[in-house]
């Protein structure tokens, strides 16, 4: 669905509409912090970190450069815009909700959302201070490269609503809206896709052209399915291997020896996921491997599985922005014509602040 939104220019239209009020501000680093918050909001509707980052590179990046922010500072804010993998359409959210056997809207609204707002605000302040400090410290960089960034297609003004439709459907037809109607993520995506398809037909008045454009949707679906199936099979085989070797029993015994409480276990598991995500360059692969094992581990310890998995999910998400090999870091660095290592220097402090805030937030809120 995100790929189709990109194809018809709906995501670009939404970004342009939300960015427009910020043009009037002439305070570069205040705009930078606000752009980060905007990016965080859009990440709920665009569940792929790289897709969102590339969209922001053609919309937000030139604006920040013209205001006087350095290329590496602007790129750091854009790369970390998908800071935490949350929302009803996020793969990790669907995995954890299924493992816990709770509805996706309940997990999203009841656990993710409050923590998401807290981390977003604190990290925006960290970006404001860190990027301003580094820009003053570092030598000025050439900003002419923004001219080489190709423009993304932009749809009509009404198209800005389409990226929001799945989220509206999922939350609207739940206990937070109309509880009498049940709607899962798949149905919400397909219904929103049908509405967007009808709008495209009205816009172009050419059935063949519109139907041909649907290949973008199904190609994106196929790519995601192949990726997910590979992760599921690989994760289950790996997890079963750990159980067969007795490593899970050894881990439970070690954790019992440490006498960890819920906060301690959340920190340990979240830190472990952060490290795995940094090494692999993926936040989803480690989760598919270890999340199915968590209920057994926490049940033996008598602790809450939800907060543990929430900490693991956030740790895995944040690890992406501390890894120079993650697709989003490589992609943004390539478009901005900077080194991944230089980008990593700019993302590290805000991401570590986000990690600490996430841990403290879980302890305080749950």
Q: Which residues does each PLM region occupy?
A:
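Core transmembrane alpha-helical segments of multi-pass membrane transporters/permeases
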Residues: 1-13, 185-249
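Long, contiguous bundles of hydrophobic transmembrane helices that form the permeation core
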Residues: 109-216, 335, 342-345, 366
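Juxtamembrane boundary at the C-terminal end of a transmembrane helix
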Residues: 359-366
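Alpha-helical transmembrane segments of multi-pass membrane proteins
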Residues: 28-42, 67-87, 107, 111, ...
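Hydrophobic alpha-helical transmembrane segments of multi-pass integral membrane proteins
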Residues: 23-59, 231-235, 256-296, 300-301, ...
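Re-entrant/interfacial helical elements at transmembrane boundaries that shape
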Residues: 13-16, 50-63, 90-101, 251, ...
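Juxtamembrane helix-boundary/capping and inter-helix hinge elements in multi-pass membrane proteins
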Residues: 7-10, 20-25, 64-72, 97-106, ...
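Short helix-coil transition sites and intra-membrane helix breaks within transmembrane domains
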Residues: 3-12, 43-55, 84-90, 226-227, ...
